[in-house]
Amino acid sequence: EGFVKKIGVSLYNYGQIDCILGNYSIDLVQLPVNILDQRLLDSGHLKTLKKYNVEIHARSVFLQGLLLMQISDIPSWFNPIKGVLNVFHKEAKKRRISTLQLALSFVQSIDEIDKVVVGVNTLEQLHQIIEVMPLKVNIRDFSSLSISDKNFLNPSNWRI
C-alpha cells in the first residue's frame, strides 16, 4: 500500500474523456492542447475534468515542433494550414516574442491546465523552454487560430 499516489490516463479526444469519466475515478489526465488544437477547451471538457477534480497535464504544446519551425521549413503537406501558421508567426513577431514563448504562454494561460509536458531533443532546447516558462504574456483570444482537421492536429496522421 502507498506505492501509487495518483492514477492517470493519456487521452486524445473528448469521446475518451466522456468514457473515462463515466466509468472510472482518475486523478489526472494528459491531453493534447495547443494554440491550433483548442477542441477540448472549446467543448468544455477541460472545465468538466476540473469539476471532477482531475489534474490536467497538457502535451503536444508545440505540435511535434511544427509551431516552432520557420515557415519556409514547413513541409508542403501542411500547405492547407500555412495561412494559420503564418498568422501565428505574425502574432509572435508583433508581440516581439518567440513562437516558443507564444505557444507555451497560450497553454499556460488556460486556467484548467495544471502542468505542461514538453519534449526536447537537445539541452539547448530545454534551456530555451526553461528561460521562457516564467515569462507571462498577455494572451488574448486566439480562437481564430483554432483548427479542427485531425489530419493536422494528430501527428500520427501526418504524411511527411
Task: Give residue spans per PLM region.
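Structured alpha/beta or helical-core interaction and ligand-binding surfaces enriched in interleaved
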Residues: 151-153
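Short, low-complexity polar/charged micro-motifs in intrinsically disordered terminal tails
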Residues: 155-157
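Beta/alpha (TIM)-barrel catalytic core signal, keyed to glycine-rich beta->alpha loops juxtaposed to Asp/Glu
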Residues: 1-147, 159
